[in-house]
Amino acid sequence: PSMEPAAEMEISGRGHGEHKLLHAAELLVDPRIDYLDMSLWDVFKDVHDAAFAGEPLLKVFTDLPRKGVALGAAGKLYSAKACEAAIASGLDFVLVGRAAVVHADFPRQALTNANFEMQALPVTRDHLAAQGLGPKFIDYMATWDGFVAA
């Protein structure tokens, strides 16, 4: 599908990150797409590409035109307030990874307690087991620096 001319003009000539941004822009106006979820590693970091210097990475994507395509992202969303800030920045939904591993009920906790935060890392193997993680997954998580206490 072709993009609207206005969307093309907004992102043309922006250098190195243009290809990925152009692809996201095309998806956000594609009537076959219900939602686009992005793993940004840190939804609040600034863009490293010189063409977008000083802009929050999230803003680069939330400013793109959307035609009924919901936009979500993951990346260091470790508290209810961080999730709320990401939504306020223009996302339609958020995805939690590590926070949901550390707290299987993170979404419920975040919705009912605006001050809820993920427990500080590292966490114990017992804590992860209590969240429903199996021994093999806990062993895998132990390979992540600073995630599982020795």
Describe each PLM feature range.
Residues 1-150:
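Flavin-dependent oxidoreductase catalytic cores
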